[in-house]
Amino acid sequence: MPTKIQIVFYSSYGHIYKMAEAIAAGAREVGDVEVTLLQVPELMPEEVQVKSGIKGYRAAFGSIPYATPEVLAEADAIIFGTPTRFGNMCSQMRNFLDQTGGLWMSGGLIGKVGSVFTSTASQHGGQETTITSFHTTLLHHGMVIVGVPYSEPGLTNMTEISGGTPYGASTLAGADGSRQPSENELQIARFQGKHVATIAKRLANNK
């Protein structure tokens, strides 16, 4: 039976979606895994989406199905992606996680691997606090937290401004959202996907 990896994300302008695709590519490098991308529902009123331009950007990944709390229980590992909002996860992701009380009651996520990636507008925009505060919810669910070890050389790349932390992959979008994930950031994301899948497979095989 394949090890099941879910990548559950929210993306406004596509940066987190691009990182999610890179993470999925890395996870698929591990043999006998099944990788599924899922997004969480939008909360923003449609008129605000149109005015801000988000609606157009989100159309690029509109075909990706929405996650439900029940579906999470089917995974061996879940990698969550969220943009930063004032050093925390976005409201869309928080709203989704607040619906997982039933899973908490049943212990449905205990022992599953949990991991997080993020994006910020600026270099010091709260990447690390977003990921580590997200970990609190995963730990309440009894998940096994996995980050990005320093065996990934992109974490110590000093030749460019780049996201990427030992807590999880990250990217910088710029104040206007014009900066796209760099190759270094995408490589860290691919590493995270492969690393999580490897550990999840090992744990699943030892059940």
From Swiss-Prot:
One Pfam family recorded for the sequence: FMN_red
SUPFAM superfamilies tied to this protein: Flavoproteins
Organism: Pseudomonas sp. (strain WBC-3)
Pathway where it operates: Xenobiotic degradation; 4-nitrophenol degradation
A molecular function GO annotation: NADP binding
A GO CC term attached to the entry: membrane
Reaction(s) catalysed (UniProt annotation): 1,4-benzoquinone + NADPH + H(+) = hydroquinone + NADP(+)
Family that this chain belongs to: Belongs to the WrbA family.
Protein name: p-benzoquinone reductase
Domain Flavodoxin-like: 5-196
Entry EC number(s): 1.6.5.6
